[in-house]
Amino acid sequence: IGVAEREDEMKNNGRTPVAVFDFDGTIISGDSFLPFMRYVVGGWKYYCGMLFLLPWLGSYAFGVIDNRRIKEKVIGYFLKGKPARDIRELGESYAESFLHTKEKPKMMAKIDEHVKESHILLLASASLLVYLKPWAEINHFDGVCGAQLEVDGEERITGRICGNNGFGQEKLDAVTEWLAERNPDKTYAYGDSQ
């Protein structure tokens, strides 16, 4: 799992409280991963691709393949070979122009409360850092745990995830490690899933 932090982030020597937020289904309505693929390739290519991926999606739905494998199949189909710089730019644009339309007002108010209290904020998700990190920076988060796209020597997307996927236990392990480094006196957690 990739972890991104703001440049000015320090260890939590003052033992400031930490608020940990899940993303998909908690801060935003629904999923961010598949809409990002549609955002990158456009509607027609996206729907054709989803038809092609249907057997894999069915295998995932029935538990035949795991979350990482289906995610890499989708990434490979839609993003493999694309310049990493282009995908980073699209991730920033997606964070600024699309994700805010899916934000849940109650959760955004909760984030604002923690920001006003000067709490440290961590965004923890199995979604892609390429758009989570810019969204988190806009919304005053101090750190982000998410899935990092693998990039080859020519700065192109390989279609794989670099490191852990950040789903289920991997997400919990990343958050636990992040919290252990800061030793907060209090932790708030917001989520809707594993």
Model-derived segments and spans:
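Metal-dependent phosphoesterase signature
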Residues: 70-106
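C-terminal cap/substrate-recognition subdomain and adjoining C-terminal extension
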Residues: 11-12, 16, 89, 96-194
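Active-site neighborhood of HAD-like aspartate-dependent phosphohydrolases
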Residues: 6-66
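Conserved alpha/beta cores of soluble small-molecule-handling proteins
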Residues: 43-46, 63-66, 83-86, 105-106, ...
